[in-house]
Amino acid sequence: PFIEVSLKVVDVEEGTGRNAGKLGALVVEGKDMDKFIKTNVGSGLTDEDRETFWKAKEKLIGQIVEVRADAITQNQETTDEWSLRFPRFLKFRGFEKGEKL
């Protein structure tokens, strides 16, 4: 079973290797069931998404994304922060796949 959560983009990270010069991951955070979640999500992004989103990275900050994951897990470094196990980008809320930001 999967869980789906809506989280806010607070930062972006450049990719490495074959994704250098493109979006590597979205840094997202928010609350779900009274748990503060902060995680990076890069899985689920196509090469085209990575290029397009990197060019418009300033517009991504503050956007809400829908993320699917296996579970919510406790952050190993801090007790008041949670993360997602195997997070996967689904879409930006309010935008359909392929729609321009």
Please place each PLM-identified region on the residue numbering.
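Nucleic-acid 5′ end/cap handling module spanning
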Residues: 1-95
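Extended, charge-rich, solvent-exposed interface segments
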Residues: 100-101
